[in-house]
Design a protein with these regions (language model features):
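Periplasmic/cell-envelope proteins involved in peptidoglycan metabolism and beta-lactam response
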Residues: 1-159, 181, 199-204, 209, ...
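Beta-lactam-recognizing serine transpeptidase/beta-lactamase-like catalytic domain environment
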Residues: 85-97, 134-187, 191-442, 471
Length: 474
C-alpha cells in the first residue's frame, strides 16, 4: 500500500523512485543459523577484495556458514554486452553478448525433523549437537545453543542489536559445533582402546587392578578413578563399560605420548575434518614437539597419563568427536563431514581424502564396539539409564571433562563450584550398533555428568529419528 501511494504521488516527489530488490530470507530463523549462516551487506574491506565486475550491483555477500563457504557457487556470474555506439550514444550494433549464469542450487543434508528433535532434546542449555551419517559423512543435524535470528543481518543490523549478541556471556554468535574447543574427557577412550589393541600393548583380555587410583612407577602422585572405591580387576570390556580411569591411565602410560598422539591423530583429533564448513577450528592434539615449541618445556609422564582420559592440553571440537566416533562405527573408513548433499544435482567430491584407519586385526573394531554397547545395555554400564527400554542397540561413550583443575586429594563439589566452572558433559554414540546409520555427539557446557545429562539427549534424538531411518528392532 505504501509503495502504491509513492508511485501515485511520484510527480510530487522529485528524485524519489521505487526500485525492486531481492532480499534473502531465512524462514527457519534461528534453527539453522549456525549451519546455513547468513548474508550481509558488503563492507569496505570486502568490496576491495571482490571482483568489481562480478559483484557490480551486488549489495550482499555470504558472511558465515554455507552462505560464506559456497559464496562463489551461489553467486553465479554476471552477463554483459560489448556494443558499438555513435557520437550520441545510440547503439549501432552488439559486438559481443555473454548471458549471465545463475548461481548453483545447493541442497543440504540437514534433516529438519532431526534438527527439531535435537533442539528440543538440548533444551535451553548451552551446548551443541551434531549428527552424522557415518556411511556418507552427511551432516543430518547441527545445533549450537543459544542461537540467533540470521534475518537480523540481511539488510543491516543496528549497533545496539549487534552489541547485545556479541557481548552476551552466552555467546549466541559462537558456533560451538565447529569452533568450541573442549577437553573430550572419556569420550576418546574407545580410540585409546583401539591404539592399545592395534599396537599390541594390550589385548582384550589384559587385566588391570583398580584400587581407585593409579600411580606411575616411582611416583607418589595418585591419579584418581572417578569411582574412588575402585572397580577391582578390569579388562577392556569392563574398562569401557565402566569408563574406568585407572585402566586408561595405565594404557596411556604403556603406549607413550608418541604412539598415543599418532593414533588419535588418525581419527581426526587436533585437525580440521570437514569438507565444507567455514571457520572450523583445528583444536589441539598435543605432542612432545608441540610442547617444546610452544612451552619450551619437556613432556612429562603424568601428561601422558591424563591424556589417556581426555584431559590435559588436548582440545577438540564436537564435530571432531562425532567424526572420531563415526570412524569407530564405520570400521575406520573416512567420510569427511559435509553439509552440501548435492550441488546442481551432483554430490560433492572430496579432493583431499583422509586415509582410512587400517588395523592389523580388523576384529578390534568389533571389540571396541562391543564395549560401547555394554556402556548402554549392561546392568553395570555407566550410561545404562539412557538406553533403558530402547528397541535397538546403541553403542555409546560418556565423558565428563573438568573446566577447572582440582587439587590433589580434593573432590569435586558442585555446591562450592561456580556454575560456569562446573564440569562439561559430553556423550557420543551411534545406532543401530551392528549396522550404524547415525552418529551423534552432544556437548553440554557445565552439564557436569556425561552419562546422566548428555546421554539422555542422545537417546531422545535417536528415538525421534528411528522410524524414519528404519532401524531394526532388537
Amino acid at each position: 500500500m505504501k509503495i502504491a501511494r509513492i508511485a501515485v504521488n511520484q510527480f510530487r516527489l522529485p528524485g524519489v523512485e521505487v526500485v525492486a530488490q531481492l532480499v534473502r530470507h531465512y524462514p527457519q530463523g534461528a534453527h539453522f543459523a549456525h549451519s546455513i549462516g547468513y548474508v550481509g551487506r558488503i563492507n569496505e574491506k570486502e568490496s576491495k577484495a571482490l571482483d568489481s565486475v562480478e559483484y557490480r550491483g551486488t549489495q550482499s555477500i555470504g558472511k558465515t556458514g554455507i552462505e560464506r563457504f559456497y559464496e562463489s557457487e551461489l553467486h553465479g556470474h554476471v552477463g554483459y554486452e560489448e556494443v558499438e555506439t555513435n557520437a550520441q550514444g545510440r547503439v549501432l550494433r552488439v559486438l559481443k553478448h555473454t548471458d549471465p549464469i545463475p548461481g548453483k542450487n545447493i541442497v543440504l543434508s540437514l534433516d529438519i525433523h532431526l534438527q527439531e528433535a535435537a533442539e528440543e532434546a538440548l533444551g535451553d542449555r548451552r551446548g551443541s549437537v551434531v549428527a552424522l551419517d557415518p556411511q556418507t559423512g552427511e551432516v543430518l543435524a547441527m545445533v549450537s545453543k543459544p542461537s540467533f535470528d540470521p534475518n537480523m543481518f540481511v539488510t543491516g543490523i543496528s549497533f545496539k542489536e549487534y552489541a547485545a549478541l556479541h557481548d552476551s556471556i552466552d555467546r549466541p554468535l559462537f558456533n560451538r559445533v565447529l569452533r568450541g574447543l573442549y577437553a573430550p574427557g572419556s569420550t576418546i577412550k574407545p580410540e585409546v582402546a583401539i591404539a592399545g589393541l592395534d599396537s599390541g600393548v594390550v589385548t582384550a583380555q589384559t587385566r588391570v587392578f583398580d584400587p581407585g587410583y593409579y600411580q606411575l612407577p616411582d611416583f607418589d602422585h595418585k591419579y584418581r578413578n572417578w569411582n574412588h572405591s575402585g572397580d577391582g580387576w578390569v579388562d577392556m570390556d569392563a574398562a569401557i563399560m565402566r569408563s574406568n580411569d585407572t585402566y586408561f591411565y595405565d594404557l596411556a602410560h604403556k603406549l607413550g605420548i608418541d604412539r598415543l598422539h599418532d593414533y588419535l591423530a588418525e581419527f581426526g583429533l587436533g585437525q580440521k575434518v570437514s569438507l565444507d564448513m567455514f571457520e572450523e577450528s583445528a583444536g589441539l592434539m598435543p605432542s612432545q614437539a608441540w610442547k617444546r615449541a610452544t612451552r619450551r618445556q619437556p613432556w612429562f609422564p603424568g601428561e601422558t597419563v591424563i591424556l589417556g582420559i581426555g584431559q590435559g592440553y588436548m582440545q577438540v571440537t564436537p564435530l571432531q568427536l562425532a567424526q572420531a566416533t563415526a570412524l569407530i562405527a564405520n570400521k575406520g573408513v573416512w567420510n569427511r563431514p559435509h553439509l552440501a548433499k548435492t550441488i546442481n544435482g551432483v554430490a560433492p567430491v572430496d579432493e583431499n581424502p583422509m586415509p582410512n584407519v587400517v588395523l592389523k586385526d580388523p576384529r578390534d573394531w568389533e571389540q571396541v564396539n562391543h564395549g560401547m554397547q555394554l556402556v548402554m545395555h549392561d546392568p553395570r554400564g555407566i550410561a545404562r539409564a539412557a538406553a533403558q527400554g530402547a528397541q535397538y542397540r546403541i553403542a555409546g561413550k560418556s565423558g565428563t571433562a573438568q573446566v577447572v583443575a582440582i587439587k590433589q586429594g580434593e573432590r569435586y563439589n558442585r555446591n562450592k563450584t561456580l556454575e560456569r566452572h562446573r564440569d562439561n558433559a559430553l556423550f557420543v554414540g551411534f545406532a543401530p550398533a551392528e549396522h550404524p546409520k547415525i552418529v551423534i555427539s552432544v556437548m553440554i557446557e557445565n552439564g557436569e555428568a556425561g552419562g546422566r545429562v548428555a546421554g539422555p539427549v542422545v537417546r531422545q534424538i535417536m528415538d525421534a529419528c528411528a522410524p524414519a531411518r528404519i532401524w531394526p528392532l532388537r
